[in-house]
């Protein structure tokens, strides 16, 4: 009580109200109390609420601004972290959902949140919300791994005025968004984002809601998804509203004459290396936004004696008006000269002459006159030896280096729509029936047989294979000079010839960039080994995988060169295995596969050549293949992080590490006392400078690790940290080493080892004010000469390794209050 009165007295000195009362809280006027409460931090209010029960309603009547409220956890343990505007932290943990929800009811009642972050798993949370009669005031809300019913329940309790809503739908394959779109906050929010969405129809449904309610200009919706066909589906739904369209964006009109809706397909640094994720942005914009319009896209596909001319409307390109104008002019000049000199071609002319003359005159007139052509107009000109089943190809700017991107359409037939095709150069397997690309119309994908395993298309929308013997250099958007080849015309010898030609070209380009001399303009097999090694050393992982397949005779040479990665991630989720590697702050490799054998082969190769700064392994079953344990390969990494791995996978991976690992982090929810003893026999654990276990469930870890250090005479500065969901670890450590104690306090104990130069120091990470359901400890090997005055009493920095969110808000923040110390009145209404 005296400490609380002291805090209140300090607050009084800052008040502008007179007189200043030097008396008990209960004797103060209500207006003074209200002024005091309004200036208190949340921690002070929680303390005052427990000591002044008679006037709890007065304390609760004052709102408080909270910068962030983070609620996360599983049913067995919940954590709530609150950060005030000034950076003060309240961090609480609960094993009881009832206690957690009572605390949240109070926080939601008095708090005005800048950001509300929710990650809860369990039906009990939804059931509690249904009985909550209050409302939540928040500017932005982030839902992480929450199901649809829980999201709807939370949003139903939110006050008007929310500006941003973010949802991670990784578990939301059941999201239909139909119920979510009925909520007024979602309809009127300025910014809405869904990540990892796994269903169709979301884009046009959001746009339709905006049209129906006449949403404000600037309203934005963003989506990341692996689902194919959303862009095409959007076009089909709003075909009568299209204002303009390009390969990556479409603009539609709304019922309001001053407003349009713009849909964009976007890419970033992550998507630069794979096509499975697509990013969309939907925006409500003013209809007066300036945009260069070109009402037609012309493309010329020219062979030796065949010319195809196609005008495709209503496709519009937003740039290059003058370039298109020039291409139109030059195209018709060449075409006119050919037709004048070849009278025989007139009988092959498949178009009305006045249409052709109109297009020819268009070159010198205003290009906007093409709008007068009835849509859709297709003008086909076949010369004498023109092949049948020719496709229209509109080259576009490729998103990634080394790839080609087109809009493709079959001439004639029922389907003359344009479809997006991506030609991948990294795949060298041509054993399938089509090119290795994916279809933007139906999303058809297939796997090839090479190790890279890029994807391909074999569907009704694509009618040809784009292969080449020479270079393919498109001029801006419009003109492509190439030789279209059907795969049925290519025998196995021709395939091998194309592969060899591609390998030589790629090798030559790599050699040109190397510093070695001389530069060889020759086949790969004719190059000296030192040049090959120089080339391989400059290759990224995808290039090496391709070279491994094409140069099997020298695979050992390719595999002899190490490749360094800043970070590597192995993820096993359900039946999927994913690999993601980055270097120089850039993702350089991403792959997902459902085949456990293929995942094992790739992991085996990565163990052989990869050198990681930081290696992370997520989820369960990564090491469940018997061959993983039988394989001789070892991971090379400085830092290892095992996240939510089952205990068998954890032990298997630890046994497959090289000895120079510097840091190991793991979860302890499946580590039993017996498994911990097995882990302590692994040499990497015995010699690693730092390792920690998060959420261990037993009390024997501290003395077992210390005993292992004593037996192995571990080096000074060896460090072990652990969070324990059980009481008694500190006492058990003291009991085990009672004959070795050098010094002891409530939070620290120091023991001697068998080496007179070394002691072991145990520290409790949270002081006596903070009593939460789990305890954090640090164990260190220290010099026997270290004085107690040299101890680091600030625990926040090293606790940051166990719980980064605590350090995230403010380095001066303190930890406050436990649910047992916070009293609630029975039947209180929040």
Curated annotation (Swiss-Prot):
A GO BP entry:
cell differentiation
State the superkingdom.
Eukaryota
SMART domains from the UniProt entry? FBOX
The cross-references to Pfam families, in alphabetical order and at most eight, read:
F-box (PF00646)
Start and end of every F-box domain? 24-69, 523-563
Q: What keywords does the record list, in alphabetical order? A: Developmental protein, Differentiation, Repeat, Sexual differentiation
**Which InterPro entries does the UniProt record give?**
F-box_dom, She-1-like
Task: Please give the knockout or disruption phenotype noted for this protein.
Answer: Temperature-sensitive phenotype in which XX animals are self-sterile, do not produce spermatocytes, but ovulate and produce progeny when mated with males; XO animals develop as males, but some switch to oogenesis in later life. Animals do not produce fog-3 proteins responsible for controlling germ cell fate. RNAi-mediated knock-down results in 95% female progeny.
Protein role: Sex-determining factor which regulates hermaphrodite development.
Please state what the protein is called: F-box protein she-1
Q: Which organism is it from?
A: Caenorhabditis briggsae
């Amino acid at each position: 009580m005296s400490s609380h009165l002291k805090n209140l007295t300090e607050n009084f000195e800052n008040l502008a109200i007179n007189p200043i009362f030097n008396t008990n809280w209960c004797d103060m006027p209500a207006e003074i109390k209200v002024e005091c409460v309004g200036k208190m931090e949340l921690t002070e209010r929680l303390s005052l609420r427990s000591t002044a029960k008679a006037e709890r309603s007065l304390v609760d009547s004052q709102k408080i601004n909270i910068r962030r409220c983070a609620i996360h956890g599983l049913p067995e343990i919940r954590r709530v972290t609150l950060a005030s505007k000034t950076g003060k932290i309240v961090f609480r943990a609960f094993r009881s959902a009832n206690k957690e929800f009572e605390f949240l009811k109070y926080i939601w009642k008095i708090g005005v949140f800048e950001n509300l972050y929710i990650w809860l798993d369990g039906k009990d949370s939804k059931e509690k919300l249904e009985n909550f009669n209050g409302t939540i005031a928040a500017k932005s809300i982030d839902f992480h791994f929450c199901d649809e019913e829980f999201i709807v329940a939370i949003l139903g309790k939110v006050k008007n005025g929310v500006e941003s809503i973010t949802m991670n739908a990784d578990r939301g394959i059941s999201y239909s968004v139909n119920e979510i779109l009925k909520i007024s906050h979602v309809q009127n929010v300025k910014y809405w984002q869904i990540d990892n969405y796994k269903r169709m129809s979301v884009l046009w449904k959001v746009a339709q809601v905006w049209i129906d309610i006449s949403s404000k200009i600037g309203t934005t919706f963003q989506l990341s998804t692996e689902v194919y066909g959303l862009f095409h589906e959007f076009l089909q739904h709003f075909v009568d509203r299209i204002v303009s369209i390009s390969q990556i964006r479409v603009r539609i009109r709304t019922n309001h004459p001053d407003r349009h809706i713009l849909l964009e397909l976007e890419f970033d640094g992550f998507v630069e290396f794979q096509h499975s994720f697509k990013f969309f942005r939907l925006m409500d914009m003013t209809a007066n936004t300036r945009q260069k319009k070109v009402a037609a896209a012309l493309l010329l596909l020219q062979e030796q004696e065949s010319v195809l001319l196609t005008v495709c409307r209503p496709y519009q390109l937003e740039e290059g008006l003058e370039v298109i104008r020039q291409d139109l002019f030059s195209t018709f000049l060449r075409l006119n000269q050919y037709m004048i000199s070849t009278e025989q071609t007139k009988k092959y002319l498949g178009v009305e002459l006045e249409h052709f003359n109109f297009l020819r005159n268009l070159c010198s007139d205003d290009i906007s006159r093409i709008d007068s052509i009835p849509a859709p107009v297709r003008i086909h000109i076949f010369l004498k030896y023109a092949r049948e089943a020719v496709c229209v190809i509109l080259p576009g700017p490729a998103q990634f280096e080394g790839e080609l991107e087109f809009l493709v359409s079959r001439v004639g037939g029922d389907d003359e729509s344009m479809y997006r095709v991506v030609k991948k150069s990294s795949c060298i397997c041509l054993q399938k029936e089509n090119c290795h690309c994916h279809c933007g119309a139906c999303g058809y994908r297939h796997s090839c047989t090479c190790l890279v395993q890029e994807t391909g298309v074999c569907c009704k929308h694509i009618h040809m294979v784009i292969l080449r013997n020479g270079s393919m250099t498109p001029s801006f958007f419009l003109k492509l000079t190439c030789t279209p080849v059907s795969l049925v015309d290519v025998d196995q010898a021709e395939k091998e010839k194309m592969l060899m030609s591609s390998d030589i070209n790629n090798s030559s380009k790599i050699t040109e960039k190397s510093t070695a001399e001389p530069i060889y303009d020759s086949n790969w097999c004719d190059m000296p080994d030192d040049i090959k090694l120089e080339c391989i050393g400059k290759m990224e992982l995808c290039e090496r995988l391709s070279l491994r397949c094409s140069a099997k005779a020298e695979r050992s040479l390719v595999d002899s060169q190490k490749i360094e990665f800043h970070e590597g991630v192995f993820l096993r989720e359900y039946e999927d295995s994913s690999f993601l590697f980055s270097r120089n702050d850039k993702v350089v490799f991403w792959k997902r596969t459902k085949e456990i054998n293929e995942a094992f082969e790739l992991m085996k190769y990565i163990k052989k050549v990869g050198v990681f700064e930081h290696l992370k392994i997520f989820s369960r079953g990564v090491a469940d293949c018997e061959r993983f344990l039988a394989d001789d390969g070892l991971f090379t990494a400085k830092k290892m992080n095992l996240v939510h791995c089952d205990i068998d996978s954890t032990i298997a991976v630890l046994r497959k590490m090289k000895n120079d690992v510097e840091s190991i982090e793991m979860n302890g929810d499946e580590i039993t006392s017996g498994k911990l003893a097995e882990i302590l026999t692994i040499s990497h654990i015995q010699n690693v400078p730092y390792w920690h276990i998060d959420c261990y469930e037993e009390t024997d870890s501290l003395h077992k690790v210390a005993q292992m250090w004593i037996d192995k005479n571990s080096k000074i500065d060896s460090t072990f940290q652990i969070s324990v969901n059980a009481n008694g670890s500190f006492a058990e450590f003291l009991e085990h080493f009672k004959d070795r104690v050098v010094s002891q306090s409530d939070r620290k104990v120091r023991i001697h080892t068998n080496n007179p130069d070394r002691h072991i120091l145990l520290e409790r990470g949270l002081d006596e004010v903070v009593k939460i359901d789990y305890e954090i400890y640090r164990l260190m090997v220290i010099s026997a000469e270290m004085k107690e005055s040299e101890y680091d009493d600030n625990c926040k920095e090293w606790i940051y390794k166990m719980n980064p969110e605590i350090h995230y808000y403010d380095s001066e923040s303190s930890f406050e209050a436990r649910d047992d110390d916070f009293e609630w009145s029975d039947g209180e209404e929040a």
